[in-house]
Structures are given as structure tokens and as C-alpha cells.
């Protein structure tokens, strides 16, 4: 679907300890990010930076936390979902121990971001709009595929228990 791959499963992540420290050095990609933000604003769009949770080690979290420094400097909203208590459970919402959310985790993140964007921006709901019928159809297909694959995974989990 749209270049993505649906992967089902659960992981045994490494122990996760949240850090608030941030990387002091300029990171790869900061220049490009500044250019993207400037281009968005030139086109009348307001960018939003996000930090999507995964079982990151301390060094990775410091890089993620640096985004807040940049967001503050550039006056860009930053939604750091690492700091939303209870949003993602790395035991059940990731399909690998490194960084990828499974459909349950992705659904939680999508719902949270959708609500956040709705509260902070004037966005219209396009569901049911005939001009976006292909999105409704794609969602229906995704949900069917997800139910089948998640059901298969649950069956496998039951056999392994």
C-alpha cells in the first residue's frame, strides 16, 4: 500500500530508559531540515516536527531530543511522542526490537497525531468526500488485510504459548 509493507509481530525490545539529554553537535541533515522548513513557509505551509517512539538507546534519544532545540530555534511545533506517557508499549506495539511499529503501534500514533493536528490546525475531515474515495477504499483494503494478518499472528502466538 503506497510503498509501505505491512509487517505483523511483536518484539522483545532492549531495556528502555528515557533520557532528556540532547545531542550538542550539529547533526547530519540539519541544513536540509532548515531548507525544508523555509520552503514550506515560503509556500504558506506550517511544518510540524514529530518524534515517533521506538526503543531507542540513549545516543539515539539525544539525537531525537535535539529536534526540540531546532524546533524552538525555528519556531516550529515539535510533537515528541516519546514524552506521551503510555502511548506506545514497546512489548506489544513493535514488530522488531530495533525501531518499527506494528499495525497496533502505528494505529495509536496515527490516532494521536490526527487528534493533535485537528486541535492545532484548521483541518477538514475528508472521509466520505467523493474526491477522496480512493483513500476510503484503500483504508478498507488495509483493514481487511490487517485483520487477516493480525489474526494469523494471534493464532501463531497461541500455538507458541
Regions found by a protein language model. Give the residues of each.
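Alpha-helical context
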Residues: 9-16, 25, 47, 82-89, ...
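Acidic-and-aromatic substrate-binding clefts and catalytic sites of carbohydrate-active enzymes
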Residues: 23-29, 55-62
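Active-site segments of SGNH/GDSL-like serine hydrolases
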Residues: 34-60
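N-terminal start-of-chain detector that recognizes signal peptides
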Residues: 19-21, 49-51, 71, 79-80
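Short, local alpha-helical segments
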Residues: 17-21, 51-53, 90-99
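C-terminal regions of proteins
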Residues: 59-140, 144-160
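Secreted/periplasmic serine-hydrolase-like ester/acetyl group-modifying domain
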Residues: 1-43, 128-161
